[in-house]
Amino acid sequence: MLIATIAGSLILVVVVVVVVIAVTNDNGTKPAAAGSSSASASPSASAFVSSKTTGPCGYTSADLAQNPNLKNTGFPPDPKPTPTKTVVADFLTNRGTIEVAFDGKAAPCNVQSIAYLIGKKFYNNTPCPRAVDSGIYVVQCGDPSGTGAGGPSYTVKDENLAAAKYTAGAVAMANGGPDTNGSQFFFITKDSSKGLQKNYTVIGHVTKGLDILEKVVNDGNDGSNQAGGGKPKLPLSFTTVKIASVVGGGPTPGSGPSPTVVTPSPTATPTPTPTAS
């Protein structure tokens, strides 16, 4: 998902001398407003409009029948107001520990979802299938299937895009178009502001272990993705992911009353899109 929705396909679009790299997650969910059945198409920057929410978040159900890479995770609790706490999580990997502070004030709905998935051990024993070292500098993770097309059984809306900054250490959601965030996200190891449009919700920052991610990017990749980047030559996998602490007021993200679930209309039913890997 660098990054995408989910995740996983990086789309390189070249127009004259303008290069746009999209981080996608190809989880098979596509909003009706996009007007296209292809989740791998590079999204229009003008289509991405978002702001912070006070809740409820209103999750959109994904079609598991059309995408076997999705997991039936149920839906996160969806209280009102949505928690705005900072969730600090430890990603124990085969190369050391990466610590991330997820910013519940900047992206409450997406952080609530991440906390929920961590609680369900969704990210345990999960590979990071893609790294990119040209144009943008990222490691894409969060897909248990390792295909770049996986994710949970729901999607989350974009948040606070206008304030997004894709600097070193930032963590952002991968997506397949507006409001299609799932479980995939990407770590940015070097300022990638020039290579990324403000289409990706920033959910937090790396507070420990950025050197691990830098090494993965710097060691290169196999170039297996036709759109750019590929499988890291230095493999990175999450072994265990756990919440280390929660800071701030309000309820704890990932806990609360039953969620509000939105089921896409028949006209918005997605068409599976194969990912380039």
Residue ranges and their predicted role:
Residues 1-277:
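Cyclophilin-like peptidyl-prolyl cis-trans isomerases
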